[in-house]
């Protein structure tokens, strides 16, 4: 979708590609499970307070505004943020990408009413050293799916030897644009400028 916009389900795209272009191996999903309102349990949070846990030197005790009026108390093991940070929060009842269901719990004798998330916990990257600090802007309580790509469908193709152009994402985008009449956006980067007065001559000859 970075290169071509289409408004049909990915299943229909897969069916059209399978008929006219190449073999479709499968459609898989990545990220937060999108079932039973689960995406609604992931929200933007604003850290109002953050300090050392009274019973654990390596934990932070945070008060996080998630748009409910009163902040939620959340215990976190990361230290790469502080008061004023905008963060990704999972509320009790949320199911994480790895299948874990988050529950309200006590950590070292203190209630934790949610979870502040890292990139890896959201399957957005491999960074697990700290939590995923968001850019300022989204209000507390904003659905996280409006800010981050929490759930994505992945189309896996088997490209045949006669279509090497489909080995790149842009080649797939060009094919989808042709099949569904979408506008193909330019590739990123600038085209090199020709220098000199002479234009290159290209000829194709049958052997």
Please tell me what each predicted stretch does.
Residues 1-207:
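Phosphate-backbone binding interfaces of nucleic-acid-interacting proteins
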